[in-house]
Amino acid sequence: MTIQKNWQELIRPNKLHVVPGSDPSRFATLIAEPLERGFGQTLGNALRRILLSSLQGAAVQSVHIDGVLHEFSSIAGVREDVTDIVLNIKDISIKMQGEGPKRMVVKKQGPGTVTAGDIQTVGDIVVLNPDLPICTLDDGAEIRMEFTVASGKGYVAAERNRPEDAPIGLIPVDSLYSPVRKVSYKVENTREGQILDYDKLTMMIETNGGVTPEDAVAFAARILQDQLNVFVNFEEPRKEVATEIIPDLAFNPGFLKKVDELELSVRSANCLKNDNIVYIGDLVQKSEAEMLRTPNFGRKSLNEIKEVLAQMGLHLGMEVPGWPPENIDELAKRFEDHY
């Protein structure tokens, strides 16, 4: 037995399916299937921990408020005390280019609410939640705050953000650098061929908008990959790749793809299976009338299949010369490896 069989013969996900949320830059559901049994929990837990703790982001490190000496002060004409203001500042979401530290300032007169959108930023800093309230000013009140922003990862407590030579009046802030706000996942059974107990991993991710959920998972997977490399204590033997002659076909090689790859609804997929329609080449030769004569196959399934085929530049009722070819299963496998 070659060592490569330890990983080459495990089933791997066909692809990552991304379902965007109401705001695709912040919310998404990602689905990976099929996975070997147990791998859904293993990968889901590892990715969740990395997403919440290890991705780089930006956050406020400290704030200086004119006329304020420490966080237990109050400010004339400002309804919130400084402790509450600092808690609100901690929730400011920021996207920053470069390392920092950098400065941003807010100055406002009352009456009214000071929000994160009032902050004056330089071109390489973007406030991602401008509607966040920071404090409320009465008539005649005025406030000026200067923030120090830096990049980092995970969570850093306020005390660790206090420089040794901190001037009087500099108030450190808890920093939540991670651009990922929430991650949850679930593992369900899924089917591949005749095997019913593979894993399906579904991850629900919310970010602050500084990175998309899809990119966040990609970064987390890359971190995990990099950390695991140290455990690989061998080099794979070089595989001699023989030059394979790919035969010329009288039809589109795409017809050799299986209809399972079309991501149809369960009802439509089952109808095709029951009618022994395995390959796209089998499907496109069928007319609409033939399809509607298939048991349990209705107009809704027909429209679904027509739409999917149209996206591929195909349609029902096509003539496919030379279909089905001899040794179709072998041909399908060979073209799967090359296209």
From Swiss-Prot:
Q: What is its EC number?
A: 2.7.7.6
Q: Where is this region: Alpha N-terminal domain (alpha-NTD)?
A: 1-235
Name one cellular component (GO) term.
Answer: DNA-directed RNA polymerase complex
* Catalytic reactions of this protein: RNA(n) + a ribonucleoside 5'-triphosphate = RNA(n+1) + diphosphate
One of the record's GO molecular function terms: protein dimerization activity
Q: Which UniProt keywords apply?
A: DNA-directed RNA polymerase, Nucleotidyltransferase, Transcription, Transferase
The enzyme's first-digit EC class, named in words, is transferase
Is Hydrolase among the key words of this record?
no
Q: Which domain of life is it from?
A: Bacteria
The GO annotation for biological process reads:
DNA-templated transcription
Pfam families recorded: RNA_pol_A_bac, RNA_pol_A_CTD, RNA_pol_L
InterPro entries, per the entry? DNA-dir_RNA_pol_insert (IPR011262), DNA-dir_RNA_pol_RpoA/D/Rpb3 (IPR011263), DNA-dir_RpoA (IPR011773), RBP11-like (IPR036603), RNAP_asu_C (IPR011260), RNApol_insert_sf (IPR036643)
Task: Please give the residue ranges the record annotates as the region Alpha C-terminal domain (alpha-CTD).
Answer: 251-339
What does the sequence similarity comment in the record state about its family?
Belongs to the RNA polymerase alpha chain family.
What is the documented function of this protein? Answer: DNA-dependent RNA polymerase catalyzes the transcription of DNA into RNA using the four ribonucleoside triphosphates as substrates.
What is recorded about the domains? The N-terminal domain is essential for RNAP assembly and basal transcription, whereas the C-terminal domain is involved in interaction with transcriptional regulators and with upstream promoter elements.
The subunit structure is: Homodimer. The RNAP catalytic core consists of 2 alpha, 1 beta, 1 beta' and 1 omega subunit. When a sigma factor is associated with the core the holoenzyme is formed, which can initiate transcription.
Name used for this protein in its record: DNA-directed RNA polymerase subunit alpha
Q: Which organism is it from?
A: Nitrobacter hamburgensis (strain DSM 10229 / NCIMB 13809 / X14)
Recorded name of the encoding gene: rpoA
